[in-house]
Amino acid sequence: MATYEPVIGLEIHAELKTKTKMFCASKNDPDERHPNVNICPVCTGQPGTLPVINKEAVYHVIKVGLALESKIAEITKWDRKNYFYPDLPKGYQISQYDEPICLGGELVVPGFSKKIKIRRIHLEEDTGRLIHEDHIGHSMVDFNRAGVPLMELVTEPDLNSGEEASAFAQELRLILRYLGVSDADMEKGQMRVEANISLKPTDLKELGVKVEIKNLNSFKAVRDAIDYEIERQSKLLDGGKKVMQETRGWNEAKGRTIIQRSKEESHDYRYFPEPDLPPIHIIVDGRASPALAGGPPTVGIDLEKIESSIPELPSQKRARFKNNYGLRDNQTAILVSNEKLANYFENVVSEFMNWDKEGPDKDSLLAPELDANPHFIEKERQEIINLSANYLLSDFLGLLNETSAEVGDTKINAENFAEWACLIHRGVITSRAAKDVLKEMWATGKDPSQIIKEKNLVQVQDKSKLEETAQKVIDENETAVSDYKKGKEASLQFLIGQVIKETRGRANPETIAGILKKLLH
């Protein structure tokens, strides 16, 4: 059997967050549930109507291009892509063919340390949505989506597996969200992935026949469909058969791709320049090019203004969290994957950073024994930052998931969370009691110290009291004591649990373990 190298390129469409559609004033509302309400004569292709460019959508695509280090075209134009389909009311789609807004660029795929080159990013209008109702025997069309601004990003064929492709798509979605240009919610169809897959023998440079898989609407579907297609093509080639150039779809239920139609080429769409829209000129340094003097009318876009609005990107935030706060890769990955959670974490960290400026009362939370020693305080600060990250990614995220809440919905402000983490680190409360305090903070928004005082949750530090409680548990559990002395370590855990129960969760398990071992020997 021959050995093949998968060669994969992606085409990713993302609906852009704008108030209105791409070429008309109809509302762009992805959450609209009533069909055919956000429409007008322009987006439904009525005779005599003229399109007007949505500048906000152009800004968004340029912002994405700059974030991905693309070359921004000085002049870009519009083209008509001609084809017939029921969800395309005009009979053509306004898109960009030979002069896209962005050319080139790259994106590093997290976890693979691999740069994937971008071929182009362009802007077009979305189609309507077909709704198939089997029980009534026909399909219906909703044009609310028709004309919505749609960004299309095309990669070079630099990917080699379904896992890589899925990771690329996830990182792109995160960038789009950080930039604020798209929610890219795949469940709502706001981001759709198409994959072009071919196989080539590892000892040859010539690429194999390309197969396109359309409209993959989840990251799992991207991974599974590509991996299936690689296997399907491998079996064909190993059996002496040819791979046909075609478009296929992904059947999630059956776990396989299915043929839809033969693959179209660009000439099948009969592209020609859009006669009703002027080209766009990208202005650099606020100055228009002299070459445009006396030329056709243009729409000017200020590149510097857009560039200045680009925030810190996910890859930059991961690196900063790792370098500045000493977080592990898995911690930074989860924190940065949710921008609101990352911002909340930063607010918690800023509390620790500011405490040394707020007087001894705050510093004593970090280092009560040596609150005058700045080096000791800094060491404690770093430990608590790491502790805070751990609790955010476990207990705090758990509460978010349990209540189906967003980070912005929490009643726990950053200052209270920071104080809570410090109290755990100092041993004022046990980890078990800390969970109860956090739940109470979640429900009420109260200060953790207030909750600890009200519920009498301060950790028992009196060794004589702990020894007394431990002896009581030993006396009342002869069977467990006997089992432990026979070598059953699980019995010790049972006894520790009983002591913790007696102290209502206010005893440190490690301290109790030491006391029990001492008393039992």
Report residues per predicted region.
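Long, charged, helix-rich clamp/arm modules that form nucleic acid-engaging surfaces
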Residues: K241-D285, T298-E489, I500
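C-terminal non-catalytic interaction appendages of large macromolecular assemblies
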Residues: A2, F143-V148, M186-V193, T202-K205, ...
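Conserved structured core elements
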Residues: K55, N144-G147, G162, S166, ...
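Intrinsic, low-complexity polybasic segments
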Residues: G286-P290, G294
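Basic, nucleic-acid-interacting segments
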Residues: M1-D285, V299-E312, N323, D329, ...
